């Protein structure tokens, strides 16, 4: 997809992920083994021991990050292309085993000259179930593989979810601490995080949602992950998808040259 000098590559067959985002020929998303931006659904981050409850029923998910289950079931699956144009792609995925409920995920990726807007929804036509939506981008720490100044992160969260030794929130909210981070933060007025590559580009990640995970412990990448709830949220803060009320979320990456 193209808009002005912005170009985005979408990979329906590889988890419905954004494979690359180039602005003026400069790649903003990490390439290689962990790359692009993948959707996290029907949960974000880790579920404790891979188990979540829906009423009296306990469901077990595969432990793909032992001892926990991480990042949902769709990031390696093949999505269907419902519609595509020069600057917008609409993808769908029907939830299947190991997720215990039937439902449909729809993702819309829309490119403008100065922004990329991501929208996702989860619908059910049968049983209600808890779910989460999020995105996991791998932004390049430095642009063009250079040795210049790395991306600087600026945001003003209201709190930080205290992280336990098991990498999951303890349930305590604490004052935000300095990085490096692999942590979830609360932004009750909406997510607003700015990445700045000094002298090159500023990219602002915004969303009406209230939780964002910031992960900058890797040398080559910085992750800013908007999501509809905290890690382990299927257990601690479930949001129900019902036949009358789908779960919906949106996030925007807007950039400007410096």
What spans do the regions from the language model cover?
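Beta-strand-rich N-terminal accessory domains
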Residues: 1-59, 191-208, 245-258
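Active-site/ligand-binding surface loops and adjacent short beta/alpha elements
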Residues: 128-130, 137-208
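Active-site pocket scaffolds in enzymes
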Residues: 201-258
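Hydrophobic residues positioned within well-ordered beta-strands of beta-sheet architectures
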Residues: 89-91, 105-107, 118, 133, ...
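A short, structured loop/turn motif at beta-sheet edges
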Residues: 53-57, 82-88, 110-115, 143, ...
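Beta-strand-rich interaction surfaces with strong enrichment in secreted/lumenal proteins
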Residues: 80, 106-108, 183, 236-242
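Extended, loop-rich substrate-binding clefts of extracytoplasmic carbohydrate-active enzymes
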Residues: 63-113
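Acidic, contiguous internal or C-terminal segments within carbohydrate-active enzymes
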Residues: 1, 8, 12, 93-137, ...
């Amino acid at each position: 997809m193209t808009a002005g000098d912005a170009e985005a590559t979408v990979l329906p067959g590889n988890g419905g992920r954004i494979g690359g985002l180039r602005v003026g020929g400069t790649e903003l998303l990490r390439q290689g083994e962990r790359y692009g931006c993948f959707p996290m659904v029907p949960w974000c981050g880790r579920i404790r021991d891979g188990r979540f409850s829906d009423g009296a029923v306990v469901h077990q998910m595969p432990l793909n990050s032992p001892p926990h289950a991480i990042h949902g079931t769709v990031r390696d699956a093949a999505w269907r292309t419902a519609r595509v144009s020069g600057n917008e792609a609409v993808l769908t995925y029907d939830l299947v085993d190991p997720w215990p409920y039937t439902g449909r995920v729809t993702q819309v990726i829309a490119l403008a000259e100065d922004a990329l807007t991501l929208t996702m929804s989860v619908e059910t036509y049968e049983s209600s179930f808890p779910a989460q939506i999020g995105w996991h981008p791998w932004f390049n720490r430095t642009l063009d593989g250079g040795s210049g100044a790395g991306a600087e992160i600026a945001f003003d969260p209201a709190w930080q979810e205290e992280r336990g030794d098991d990498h999951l929130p303890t349930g305590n909210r604490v004052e935000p601490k300095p990085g490096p981070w692999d942590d979830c933060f609360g932004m009750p007025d909406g997510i607003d995080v700015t990445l700045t590559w000094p002298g090159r580009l500023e990219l602002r990640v915004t969303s009406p949602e209230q939780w964002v995970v910031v992960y900058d412990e890797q040398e080559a990448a910085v992750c800013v992950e908007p999501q509809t709830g905290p890690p382990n949220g299927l257990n601690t803060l479930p949001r129900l998808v019902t036949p009358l009320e789908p779960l919906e979320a949106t996030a925007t990456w807007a950039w400007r040259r410096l």
